[in-house]
């Protein structure tokens, strides 16, 4: 064998080994995410739906749960996509010729972006509708009852839904792009239809993030306050615990001996009051057992971190708005080739990259908090071991829409300079200056408004409670109803 043939063979072997290595790494990453999501979903599913007398119903619910687990794993992968790419770029910059990180390259990152895009399309368009129709189906009339009959009905329903959505998107694309090519795009299903449909879904997710993230940023302060032990400077915990235990014992006595009282009792109301008192007592015991560091330092530091992260997010978006007016390069754009390890995507180097990753995760958590806090989606909030299968499907779809829009959301707001890879950068609306500019301005305005309205009121209430001023005898003139009552007396 001649020398050129040996060189060609060695190059082919190297490409083959790199491709196999990328497949193994991608499979291991997905398997890890899948296991984590399966453990997470089993904590929220309703056990009665999987232990029913009808084996067909239990089998259908198990299949639907596996599809939801797959979708949630893709959603988690979409969340980790941009932070993993930013960190990988900084690692390659710091260790360019390290033997142990040769597996980390641009081809792997680009492949992960393409896989997330592909499976996001697959989950949103096929798997989740299939799971929903599968759980709701009963089989065609006259057919044999069982899983196979439900599969036939689900496939027919899914085909009809696919034709309906395909026709609607084709008509919409023909109206928007009024030319012959757009009308003939129905035949170019893979290259035009799916990216266009996913572009619409991504735009919907970005709009949803625009609404939920400012609301979540404002709600993060109250949510963190519920999770941490708040400082109380002028209060006696022992006295509050004694009063709570006394009230709980009195309510328990009334529930156990309802005949001892001559008034009619609302047992449901008494049970709710008892549950509230038990919850309050548990919180008081938690605060009593907390250390002085947790009581006096942990809560203020957490509030300060939230305030710094929120203020930094608004500041970065404000700077990005100015850059949009000055420099055309600030517009989000796609990048077909992943050229990693050449230049840092932050002006502050590795520290700036870490800040970008922290901000991306913080905004994603805030958007989820805002999503479940909004009145429109509050009914979707999952409950521990009491979430129906259809509700799990709805949660997985919403989380996938939010998470798949996170890379576009972060790049549109200028939180990172990392350009969108693969089909994520092919969205037509990303090149529209007015959409991007108005989106940034709306985010900055809504976030500032929510913070000013919520944070100031929360801080004022917390300071009043911290110093015990809420229990002080206030002047009667501050309360109109009370003043009128005293005047009548």
Swiss-Prot record:
GO terms for biological process: hematopoietic stem cell differentiation; negative regulation of canonical Wnt signaling pathway; receptor-mediated endocytosis; T cell apoptotic process; T cell differentiation; T cell proliferation; Wnt signaling pathway. The keyword rRNA-binding does not apply. The chain crosses the membrane at residues 22-42, 67-87, 115-135, 155-175, 197-217, 306-326, 351-371, 389-409, 432-452. Residues 1-21, 88-114, 176-196, 327-350, 410-431 are extracellular. Its main location: membrane. Keywords: Cell membrane, Endocytosis, Endoplasmic reticulum, Membrane, Receptor, Transmembrane, Transmembrane helix, Wnt signaling pathway. GO terms for molecular function: transmembrane signaling receptor activity. Residues 1-76 are annotated as: LCN1-binding. InterPro entries: LIMR, LMBR1-like_membr_prot. Residues 43-66, 136-154, 218-305, 372-388, 453-489 are cytoplasmic. The keyword Transmembrane applies. It is found in: Cell membrane; Endoplasmic reticulum membrane. Residues 1-59 are annotated as: Interaction with LGB. One of its GO terms (cellular component) is endoplasmic reticulum membrane. It is a multi-pass membrane protein. Dimer. Can also form higher oligomers. Interacts with LCN1; this interaction mediates the endocytosis of LCN1. Interacts with UBAC2, FAF2, VCP, AMFR, ZNRF3, CTNNB1, LRP6, GSK3A, GSK3B, FZD6, DVL2 and RNF43. Interaction with LGB and SCGB1A1 is controversial. Belongs to the LIMR family. Plays an essential role in lymphocyte development by negatively regulating the canonical Wnt signaling pathway. In association with UBAC2 and E3 ubiquitin-protein ligase AMFR, promotes the ubiquitin-mediated degradation of CTNNB1 and Wnt receptors FZD6 and LRP6. LMBR1L stabilizes the beta-catenin destruction complex that is required for regulating CTNNB1 levels. Acts as a LCN1 receptor and can mediate its endocytosis. This is Protein LMBR1L. It comes from Macaca fascicularis (Crab-eating macaque). The gene is LMBR1L.
